[in-house]
């Protein structure tokens, strides 16, 4: 047989060729063998050796060795000695009826070893010391067998031409490791597998195994004799295996690794396999010395499919039988194979990385008698069919896959099972596997990652017996409890994604167990069997308020009396099911009052939550659930009393109460959300325990509903002490159903609309036991309201009932309404029991109506009405037909008050109104008291007769010109007293009031007619009112009635006091008064007297009286024309005419020394208060006091001359002299003068004269504009242009500052500053050109070449700050950016300015010849001017563009001339502040914008001389002239309302003389740079020139305002220095600084330079 190449041997021995690779290689070698086989050698000698002896011979007989790859047929009963070194032969065939000895003397490889001919016999193999026998099992094909040749090279068929199968080792008998270190190797060319192994039959036995090593390097080998266990070392390569299916000792035991033998796995990937088969009548107990596997290199399979078996640790169960207890010491795998009814028992510790439990058919049993541990990343897989596993010690199954099998792991008492269990890893949708705890136990995760589920879609976790099973982590499994004492204890954070007690245990039934929590936990499935047989007994929450039990199931079913226990610190139950119907069939037991939360906040209004059980405890020591949040669900609370501290109802949520008792301390809900339903289906009553609050005042419920009565007579709500109901609507489902019973005492509140919705009324209300009930909203009842046992019904809204009665006469109805309400009762056929009293406590009015025709008795009766608390101003309207003196009782009606009469607005009373009946007030009848005045009202055209001497009430009528009052209570020497007749001016008037006796009326008289009978005196006005509206008639026949008005009387302007007979009746005013009409021209009264001191009278109507005596009163003429007529009039106080007319119609009026006149002139309409003295009247006076004339003058002062207004008209009929005038001018017009004169016709008149020019001139003089040049002339021009809008707007100015600012902003300008800045811009450009000329003129001049210096800064014209460094080329381009900051202070009265300029000059020049240079340049500038002083706020922007030509000529030695011409265009944007007054004289700022173009042009010429003063110093004196001319275009301002000016200007020009010198130093070399320094100084003097005479006019103005003159200085001084830096002949850079100084003017300029020479 051909040998394998050496490299292949090395690969295999090194483990670099896998089992599959080796198979491919071996197959290749076999397929090539057909051509390689030479011989079929047969034995025939006594001493047979493969090197030749004992085999068939050649033709010339010789001992020829057996060729490699030959097959050997043993024909003779002689042993065979394989003595060829590294011999490799195809196989052995036993062809003799003897057991044949085979000795391996050299390392030998054999293929098959068969006894196919004589199968009763075998080859007995003996391996010599240190020798290796490798068996490949290579077979022979038919073609190969037919083609073999003998030693004589003659074809002799092998095995008669029949094939030998691969792996035919049936001929193997005893294998004797004759001497130490011999080795048997199974390296099958055609590897076998575990399912189809190479089986060594019963004849194959091991002898002297202690000397040998058995290597399985390729293929699966199954041995049948226990002697194989005696081999010193069995080595199994990756992917290969050995199967022990052996006989056993008398105890059916196979001892492995005994006596120092070992079974080793030599591979690196842990796929080598040791299989232990439990065999019928043979080995069933595998006794292991040490541990199998380890170092993660092999898999051990224990197979009891055929018969029960046991894998035992020889050292005892507490020792490892598989792997060792460390990461590297574990077996790579452990497989347990069982079958239906078969048991595999592992009596020792198992440490394997991966474990497989497989059952050929269902219900195989695996028992682990000690630890099972697959390690941190190990796995367990259940395969083939369902099996059961029992553990006895804490075990770690790692990542366990139940493989979609109904497998079970049973955990005994006090054992911890660790792992992460999956029902079907290949299909997560499947559910399989059960973990059963017999008693106490723990199920833990094997993963350090808390996000990894402990169980994932397994069927169940069972607690089958009494004990506590502790769970943690996340589980997707059903929890099953099989014993009443079974408990699942959930650690903090545990999640159960499954049901509880829905399915029977494996092998048992469910029972009512318990779930307890150590912290927060989640159970997503239903709890408790719906049939109730397996309902849960108890759920106990963690004793921690911060922990939550989340329940996601729709059915939470407890056993009878089952509880959910909230311990002392409470905890939260969170309900999250999305099913439509959710049932919690548990009692909620509360350990500590106001603890614990039920959170169903996630439920929607499409879901119904039913709680069938008690919540908390109601009793002497209430224990309430801290909070129950129902979300938006409909929640039904039934089958037990409920105690909840806070009931939270989400939007659209509803709670239904049944027939039990409910304590809800408070509800939390959005305003107008949430519904409570009372539905006592078992009996007709629901009870609200004391302290219940449904809704709140700030957040009422949407609805409280009384459910249908069903088969009951009524639906009754029994209300405990202190219960409050707040809802927008309180409704009843059935009409006339729903009754309230308040009998627990205390105070109850019912807030909301009670009944009436959809026409459904409630039934009855009953109050007993001293209970106070407040119905704050509208309430509608069909039945009666009964109040007994000192109870009080408080009504705050409309109230409807059949009647309101008190059987024991102790009931009180109290009105607490804040707005008007109506009480509607039915007329009764028989009298009802009287109320103790009606109390009014709120400020709202109450109307009591009666309807129906059942009888003539009233629906509510009482003899007392009491006003208390906040009822001041409230009105009670009694039912029609109840008078003040009857009220249906034997005694008159008593009206009491304790609310006083004072309010923030004055006097007020609570009132009772009757209608449809006349009343008589008897003397002694209790109506009000001295400190608590009440009101009596007539609601119809009926009468009241007052016989009480003192009536502590005012009387009024509701309807105008209805009701009569007769006042007869006075007695001789004691006038009667009443507190007003009518409520005030403008209110309804009595039709008639009659005073038959003297009276003090301490209030108003509001009557169409009030008659004061002859001889009767009435004093009116006081604490209850001071109004008089209507008419008072003095006297019943003779006109000799008298009326006296108290201090402060207010008569309506239309009121009238008349007399039944001319010149009779007196009217007296005791203090201040507004007076209406008194008497008339035909029937004057006898006298009108004003007797108060230091008082005043407002005259609103005409007064006709024989005597009018105003005393010292100050008179106010309130109406437009007041007439005084009669006999004599006396005035000795101020007459304030306002703008009205006082007419003296007749008689003589005498004015005393204190008389003065005050009038008001309103120029807007020309009205002036004045006095008219008609013919037949005379006014006599001496000299009056000061005449005060108030002028409200907003009128236009745009007039000339004098206007007049008459103050007293009557000429000589005014006999006297007015006092000196005092003018008080208000309004916006300051620009007129007023005076008082007596005209030629003797009338007194007021004059008004225009004074605008003087006012404005003074305003300007006292303002910042004062002293500004030209301002006085422009002010005169402005105020004389009276037809302009600006002038008219000025006249609204309120004060001198506003006036000055308005005018000053118009008549001053900034044109001088702008022009000077524009000229300076042109000079800046010329300076830059002079710099360039100063440099270029040095070109080719020997005298100056050495000293050539840099440029200077900005100076006038051609005065350079120094010349640039010498050029060595004929032409170049240059650019000089510059920045200038100039400040001109105020000078000569002309406002200063600040100007900032940025610009750049860019030039290009060339040498025309050696002495002449010419060039051109452009300049771009931007200047921002901010004007100062009185022009502060004005701004100007100037954007300029210029074009220039320049040149320089060298004259005679050291003399030169240079010059330039410039033309520039500037765009000017000017913004000037102006002002505007609104109609009220309020001043606002506006901006006048002017945009125009400016053109400036000119030139300059300078001559100079270069003088070398000393070595390194060049002095150049210079002198020259500059001329510039500037012209602005005309423009019109925009942006203001009245102050836009048209501006017209002419040209400006200027000629300057320039004298100065510059000094240049020699070149300084710094590193590689040449630096040229320079300093200079120049004087610039203005020789001649002028600024443009700019003129401006407003719209409508004819004479223009002129611009302000230039006041700036003529002489200025320039000082500067600069430096240029040159790095090479082409590039040059520079920097310079200049200061320009003159009187009150400074400017600073900085320049940069860059030049490129060509």
Swiss-Prot record:
Name the domain of life: Bacteria
A GO cellular component entry from the record? cell surface
Describe PTMs of this protein.
The N-terminus is blocked.
| Record Pfam families | Autotransporter, rOmpB_passenger
Q: Which InterPro entries match?
A: Autotransporte_beta, Autotransporte_beta_dom_sf, OM_autotransptr_brl_dom, OmpB_passenger_Rickettsia, OmpB_ricketsia
Q: Which UniProt keywords apply?
A: Cell outer membrane, Membrane, Periplasm, Secreted, Transmembrane, Transmembrane beta strand, Virulence
Residues of the propeptide: 1334-1361
Residues forming the Autotransporter domain are: 1366-1654
- Coiled-coil segments, which residues? none
Check the record and name the Gene3D superfamilies matching this protein: Autotransporter beta-domain
Question: Transmembrane segments in this chain: where?
Answer: none
Question: What is the purpose of this protein?
Answer: The 120 kDa surface-exposed protein is a major structural protein which may play a role as a rickettsial virulence factor and/or immunogen during infection.
Q: Which family does it belong to?
A: Belongs to the rickettsiae OmpA/OmpB family.
Q: What is this protein called?
A: Outer membrane protein B
Native source species:
Rickettsia rickettsii
Q: Identify the taxonomic lineage of the organism of origin.
A: Bacteria, Pseudomonadati, Pseudomonadota, Alphaproteobacteria, Rickettsiales
